[in-house]
Amino acid sequence: ALNDGHLGGMPPAVVLDAEKALAKVMRKAAKRGLVSSAHDVSEGGLAVTLAESAFRGNLGFRVSLPGDDATVALFSESAARAVVSLPEASVDEFLALCAKRGVPVTRLGEVTAEPVLDFGVLSLGLDEARDAWLAPIPAALG
């Protein structure tokens, strides 16, 4: 697909070993009470994952996107990825779990009490983003 000059590619490949390792890390982290929230990165990529997580908690966030291409960072639907929020006191233990299973980690940013979704390249108010996210539902129902 071509959108705003960015050419998309093939659907993401599923690497079962990576999925299995991520699942093991997430189960252990949940069992140990390390995570405050977790959300798979799938439909819509990182942008939708972060927004849905913010909507659920009525919180904001401030992130720095990895890589050089914001479009890829925000909308890639690569498999075997999750966004996790956790207290600072749990970070080292969570990183150790990931390292033990060979699960790569990218620290993106922080959750904020301010209701702003700050993607680094774009910021939206929480209510504005939620309204845009919900808008297709009434339109589809007529």
Predicted regions and their residues:
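Gly-rich Lys/Arg/Thr-decorated short loops/hinges at beta-loop-alpha junctions or inter-strand turns
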Residues: 1-13
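Glycine-/charge-enriched secondary-structure boundary and capping motifs
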Residues: 8-11, 21-23, 29-142
